């Protein structure tokens, strides 16, 4: 079980149960859309963000992105990391039928997928020695436009193809994708990847 410094924020108790089997970390549940009307919980999350940092880990469906985007506006950006699980179609064991979009949520993810999502988000694993991070050239909106991933004909289809290739959720906007790409890679590596397509 991996020990993580940051507080992980998930949608519900089943997500929390899954994480408890994978990581040793403080996990806070939002209660789904109830967080929109819970000023005390948002204030609590702000305090946790200031003290330990937060990692937002919501489902990759539309509802998960509505909640994630609400939190992006309610919490200080510099204290919050975004962890994305891939779009994997299926049904959780406890459910009779798949969700509306047919995708597995956090609760249905395998431990290695959750750990990889947390690692890609920049989680601080307290049980490993930190290696100095190499300086990397960030990806900009101008780069996305130059590569045909934003602002042009067919850019949406190219973005979707790249998102699938990188195991990122299909609901990411161009700005959300830019944020995720900068967590995962740098300008040079992405340029190489796009040339290989």
Where are these regions (language model features)?
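Acidic, glycine-rich catalytic loops of TOPRIM or P-loop NTPase phosphate-binding modules used
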Residues: 6-7, 13-17, 21-51
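Short beta-strand scaffold positions
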Residues: 10-11, 58
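Amphipathic alpha-helical transducer elements in NTP-driven molecular machines
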Residues: 13-16, 42, 64-68, 107-115, ...
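Acidic, metal-coordinating catalytic cores used for nucleic-acid/nucleotide bond scission
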Residues: 34-35, 57-67
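Phosphate- and other anionic-substrate recognition elements at nucleic-acid/protein interfaces
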Residues: 44, 62-76, 112, 123-127
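Activity-critical C-terminal alpha-helical subdomain
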Residues: 85-134, 138
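C-terminal, charge/polar-rich interaction regions
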Residues: 116-119, 123, 128-197
